[in-house]
C-alpha cells in the first residue's frame, strides 16, 4: 500500500515539475514578445518624433509661402 502511495506522490510531483517547466517556457516566450513589443514602441516613438519635426517644418514653410502670396496679392492690387 505504501508503494502505491509513493507512486501517486511521484506522479503528482512529476506533473508539478512538468507544469512548472511549461510555465517557465511560456514566461520566456512572453518575455521575448514583450521585448519585441518594446522595440516596436521605441521605433514608433522615433517615427512619431520625426513626423512631428517634419510637421513643424512644413507649417513654417506654409507660413513663409502665405506671406509671399499675400505680398504678391498686395502688389497685384497696387497695379
Curated annotation (Swiss-Prot):
Localization, UniProt: Cytoplasm
Gene3D superfamilies documented for this protein: 1.20.5.340
Stretches of the chain forming a coiled coil according to its record: 4-78
GO cellular component: a single term: cytoplasm
Cystine pairings recorded for this chain: none
InterPro entries, per database record: Cell_div_ZapB
Predominant location category: cytoplasm
Biological-process GO terms, alphabetical: division septum assembly; FtsZ-dependent cytokinesis
One protein family per Pfam: ZapB
Transferase keyword on record: no
Keyword Transferase listed: no
Subunit structure: Homodimer. The ends of the coiled-coil dimer bind to each other, forming polymers. Interacts with FtsZ.
Task of the protein: Non-essential, abundant cell division factor that is required for proper Z-ring formation. It is recruited early to the divisome by direct interaction with FtsZ, stimulating Z-ring assembly and thereby promoting cell division earlier in the cell cycle. Its recruitment to the Z-ring requires functional FtsA or ZipA.
HAMAP family, alphabetized: ZapB (MF_01196)
Family membership noted in the UniProt record: Belongs to the ZapB family.
UniProt name for this protein: Cell division protein ZapB
